[in-house]
Each structure stands twice: as C-alpha cells, then as structure tokens.
C-alpha cells in the first residue's frame, strides 16, 4: 500500500536530477547527524572532567539546531514545495519593515526612546509571503534624474506631512500630481545647501567645500538627514555620506533618501550602539536632528565620539544653539553650550562657530586622555567584540586601537593587498555587468558576446554587496565609471573587514543575515553576494527567509547576482522560483565548482 512515505519519495523524483541528488545527499547527512547526536553527546558527558566539554556541547547543540532548520527547509523542498510560489502579503505590508514594531515595543515595557530601537527579539512568528509594491508604484528614474525627481507613489508620505515638514532639509520642493521634485538649491540654512557646505568648509579652514577631501574628510555620518539634500550635495563632491534616521511609519527620511539614490539606512542610538566599529567616520553631521545630547550620562555624545575618527569633526546646527540674552555673562542654556561642556571631558575642541552652526574637532593625540582630570569620563576596556547593537557604554572607546590615525595624516587612498582583489574586482564586474541584460532570459540564453550592447552605465544606482569582504566590487564599480554606490555589508560572524571598507572611503555596515536588514521595501536596484549562502550554512538561518528578505528590499525589475558552489546554487535557484524571480545558472567555465545565479525580479502589478 502506497502511503505518505511513497508519495514523498515520488515528489523528490519529480525534481530536477541535480537537485534530487543534492537533496538525497544532504537529507541523509542531516538524518545521520540527528541519529548520532545523543550518542555523541553521551560520549562527551562521560568525559566531563575536561574544561572543553561546555564549549563542545554548546557548539554541537548549535549544529543540531542548524540541522533541524535545514531539515525543515529540505523537507519542504522534497515534498514538492519548490514548485509552489510564496503567496502575496496583504496591503498592510506594502511598506513593512521587520523588527520595528513601536506598539509592540511599548507593550513589552520599553520606553524613553527604546521603543524606537530595533528589536528583532520581539518579532512574532514570521509570515512567509512576498511583499507587493503599491498600486501606483513606478520604476524609479535613472540617475542622475532620479536624484531630483521621484514618483510620489513610491514613498509613503501624505501631502499634509510633506507641506508641514519644518526641517531645514525639506524646503523649496514641489509636490506635483505624481512626482516630488527636489531643487538643487533647497534652502538648507541661510542661502542654500551649497552655501551651508561652503560655510562648514570655511569653519574647518578650507577655501571651499571642494577641498573637504584634502582635509581628510571622505566619509560623513549624517544623523537625521531630512530628505537628503545635504547628502546629495556631498555625493556631488565625490564624498560618501551615510544617512541614518529612526524608523518612521510614514514620511520616512531614509525611504526618501534611498528613493533618490542616496546612501541611507534606518538607525538610531537611543539605547544601542550603531552597527559600525570604533573610528569609522571622518565627520558626523547633525542639522536639527532632534537629539538631546546631555541625557543618559552623555552616552549619546560618547557614541558619536566612538564612531568618529581621530582628528574628525562633529557639526551641530540648530536654531536653539543661539545664546539666550545679549549680555556676555548671560547664562547660556543652548544645546551647543551643553555639548561644549561635555566635549572638554572627551578631548574635543570647539574649532569654530558661525550663527547656528558649531564645529568641534576630536583630538588626534591619544595622550590627551591620560592628561585629563580624574573626574573625566573613563576609558573603555576595548576588546575584540563586534559592535552589533550592543548597549551604549558610559566610557570613551577606541583610544588603544591600532587604527588610531588622524584623518589628516593617513594616505590619500587606503587599500588592501588581498589576493581576492583581482578575483572579485574588475574581471568579475565585467563578467557580471555583461549578464545584466534580457538576453539571458530568452529561450536560448547565451553569454553576451563583444558584439552585444552592454547595459547602460546608469541602469542601477543602489547596490548592496551582502558579503562584501574588502569592498572590491565597490572599487571595481568606481574604476569602471558606473554611477552606483554600494552598501557593503559584512556578516557579523565573518571576518570583520568593515574597518578596511570604511578606511577606503566606502559605505558599509555590520549585519546578521539571520535577521532582516534595516531598510524599507524596494530600496535596492541590485543585490550581490559571493559565497554568502555557503557562509550562512553554519548559521541558524533559513535560506527561505533570506530570499524573502532579499525580495522585500529589492525593487521590481531589480537584479540579484549570487556566486557560490554548484550545489548551493541549485538550491538557491529553486528558492528563486518560489519568489517568482527569473533566474539562470551560469557556468564560469573555469574548471571550478563555482556557478553564478543571475536573477531578475519581475514587476508584478496589482
């Protein structure tokens, strides 16, 4: 009698031969691990006198947990689920960002700003569904036109929110019938964003804002970036700004900045450290960012100090910076006054002040900290831990780091001698770029030849390298003159190469791919990952959930390029079909077991 076991086996034989063989092999290994786990655990228990036993047991338990996750995923594939596409999510998830449930956080007892933080631990059971775009969504305009004009239906903002916005970065923009237009001169303080940037340059001692790089300023952390006007100007100066702002259900600064093709991500530091290592940025900028700097034992300002490089600058602009009263001895209660009092305790110096803008410079001499009074803020005992949303600390970080190098003294171009530079650099980029064409999705796909036209240099703008290593894909894009920027993501359990990426002047962040990425849906044009799937095989992650997350952050008609071992790529192709991507596996023809999976997300309209 043919029971459920026979049907399961029959469904496996219905899959493609390569997937079928792979599934049998992996399921067999998982079953063997599950059967032998108790025996192995007992053998370790019998030698409990060894100090290694707790670590061995903990690591083995982690393997068993991962085996269970893999088994469930493989079982669903073996039962024919690979032929079943994920359902579409409801309308309420069109702008859904996981891990930011303010209502749920309040119910959990979080308050004083912590309810606005990222809390993946409170996520309910995941609903496996594909997030659809809004009914009036349109493909963004190509860069640079898309920097100044975006479709209003692509962002979640009401007309009243737009018109009532009072931040210094949101003036003189036009909300037309279905477009939002950003002027190059959009009223950012005084006579415009260019004048504002020039003023900051003069406060540093430069002739103009075109000389920022000469002063060592290449990377800028922009806190509360409004609609991205300041960041857009810095991009035009070939600098790398990264906008961070708290999660907003509507009228999001981060969503608007990314829609304009500007680097941004959801982030705040009310109670947790930012996912960047110490000494990451050359400048931190806050223009009416709404931060109260002197609360929580000044830990918010200490977090700015942690990510600021030696010799770097902190720019604070706010109308409340003006002193109250006209007499010299009038007691000042402005934000800048309170920050200045704290700055003396952390070896910052007030370099300049003009109107509502104040500029502090962090010391480049680490001996300054030992010469302070005993009442000053203590130094942290810096370790090797990765700063991935750790609690804020009431101490000064990075003073003993080998990367303590003044931004004015470092080499003009930081790089790496990695052997992977050539493998994952220009040659790989040319290979990938030639594949971004509808030719591979024809009935007879082929590798484009020299006679085939390449995609335009500006067909994509927002790129995410999900396993960035040293940022070599980013470097290759720049060398080839592509009009794209890259969010270089370093997995938390991989080698921490983010300091190298940031020292090269690129954007980057630490992230755990077992969790959703802190961004809004449809914010990236291309996702790239080299051997990420193999790396995640040792983590407690579900590849199904990873592909759903990739689909969430990828815009319609966006691209995915995955490079990995042939077995993993075959499994990835099955998952790509479940999220409705058009996919092709490309043999690199180099004698290795590496394959490319090139996918394009279709634009499925309602």
UniProtKB/Swiss-Prot annotation:
Membrane topology, as annotated: Single-pass type II membrane protein
EC annotation from Swiss-Prot or TrEMBL: 2.1.1.-
Record: glycosylation sites: 101, 409
GO molecular function: methyltransferase activity
Predominant cellular place of this UniProt entry's protein: endoplasmic reticulum
The protein's enzyme class: transferase
Entry's Gene Ontology cellular component terms: endoplasmic reticulum membrane; Golgi apparatus; Golgi trans cisterna
UniProt superkingdom: Eukaryota
Protein keywords: Endoplasmic reticulum, Glycoprotein, Membrane, Methyltransferase, Signal-anchor, Transferase, Transmembrane, Transmembrane helix
InterPro entries for the chain: Put_SAM_MeTrfase (IPR004159), SAM-dependent_MTases_sf (IPR029063)
SUPFAM superfamilies reported in the protein's UniProt record: S-adenosyl-L-methionine-dependent methyltransferases (SSF53335)
A GO BP entry: methylation
Alphabetized CDD domains for the sequence: AdoMet_MTases
Transmembrane segments: 21-41
Lumenal side, ranges: 42-606
Family: Belongs to the methyltransferase superfamily.
UniProt name for this protein: Probable methyltransferase PMT5
Organism of origin: Arabidopsis thaliana
Lineage: Eukaryota, Viridiplantae, Streptophyta, Embryophyta, Tracheophyta
């Amino acid at each position: 009698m043919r029971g459920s076991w026979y049907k399961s086996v029959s469904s496996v034989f219905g899959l493609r031969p390569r997937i079928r063989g792979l599934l049998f092999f992996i399921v067999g290994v998982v079953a063997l691990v599950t059967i032998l786990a108790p025996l192995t655990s007992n053998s370790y228990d019998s030698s409990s006198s060894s100090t290694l036993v707790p670590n061995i047991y903990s690591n083995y338990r982690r393997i068993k947990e991962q085996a269970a996750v893999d088994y469930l995923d493989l079982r669903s594939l073996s039962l024919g689920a690979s032929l079943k596409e994920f359902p579409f999510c409801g309308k309420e998830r069109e702008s859904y960002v996981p891990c930011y449930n303010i209502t749920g956080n309040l119910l959990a007892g979080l308050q004083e700003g912590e309810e606005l933080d990222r809390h993946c631990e409170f996520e309910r059971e995941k609903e496996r569904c594909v997030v659809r775009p809004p009914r009036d969504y349109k493909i963004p305009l190509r860069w640079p036109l898309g920097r100044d004009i975006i479709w209003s239906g692509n962002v979640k903002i009401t007309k009243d929110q737009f018109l009532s916005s009072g931040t210094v970065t949101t003036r003189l923009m036009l909300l037309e019938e279905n477009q939002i237009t950003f002027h190059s001169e959009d009223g950012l303080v005084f006579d415009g964003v260019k004048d504002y940037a020039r003023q900051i340059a003069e406060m540093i001692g430069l002739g103009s804002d075109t000389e920022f790089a000469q002063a060592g300023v290449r990377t800028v952390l922009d806190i509360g970036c409004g609609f991205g006007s300041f960041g857009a100007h810095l991009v035009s100066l070939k600098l790398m700004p990264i906008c961070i702002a708290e999660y907003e259900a509507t009228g999001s600064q981060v969503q608007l900045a990314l829609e304009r093709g500007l680097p941004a991500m959801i982030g705040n530091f009310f109670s947790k450290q930012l996912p960047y290592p110490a000494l990451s940025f050359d400048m931190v900028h806050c223009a009416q960012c709404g931060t109260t700097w002197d609360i929580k034992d000044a830990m918010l300002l200490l977090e700015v100090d942690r990510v600021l490089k030696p010799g770097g600058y902190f720019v604070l602009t706010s109308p409340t910076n003006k002193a109250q009263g006209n007499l010299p001895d009038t007691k000042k209660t402005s934000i800048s006054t309170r920050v200045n009092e704290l700055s003396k305790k952390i070896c910052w110096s007030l370099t300049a002040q003009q109107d509502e803008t104040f500029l502090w410079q962090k010391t480049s001499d680490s001996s300054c900290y030992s010469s302070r009074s005993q009442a000053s803020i203590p130094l942290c005992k810096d370790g090797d831990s990765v700063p991935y949303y750790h609690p804020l600390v009431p101490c000064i970080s990075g003073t003993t780091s080998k990367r303590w190098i003044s931004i004015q003294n470092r080499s003009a171009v930081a790089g790496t001698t990695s052997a992977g530079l050539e493998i994952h650099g220009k040659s790989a980029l040319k290979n990938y770029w030639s594949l971004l064409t509808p030719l591979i999705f024809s009935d007879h796909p082929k590798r484009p030849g020299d006679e085939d036209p390449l995609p335009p240099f500006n067909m994509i703008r927002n790129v995410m390298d999900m396993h960035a290593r040293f940022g070599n894909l980013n470097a290759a894009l720049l060398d080839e003159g592509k009009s794209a920027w890259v969010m270089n993501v370093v997995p938390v359990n991989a080698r921490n190469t983010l300091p190298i990426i940031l020292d090269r002047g690129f954007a980057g962040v630490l992230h755990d791919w077992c969790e959703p990425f802190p961004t809004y849906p449809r914010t990236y044009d291309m996702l790239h990952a080299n051997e990420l799937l193999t790396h995640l095989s040792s983590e407690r992650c579900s590849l199904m959930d990873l592909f759903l997350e990739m689909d969430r952050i990828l815009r319609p008609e966006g691209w995915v390029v995955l490079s990995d071992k042939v077995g993993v790529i075959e499994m990835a192709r099955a998952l790509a079909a479940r999220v409705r991507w058009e996919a092709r596996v490309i043999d690199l023809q180099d004698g290795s077991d590496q394959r490319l999976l090139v996918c394009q997300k279709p634009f499925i309209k309602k």
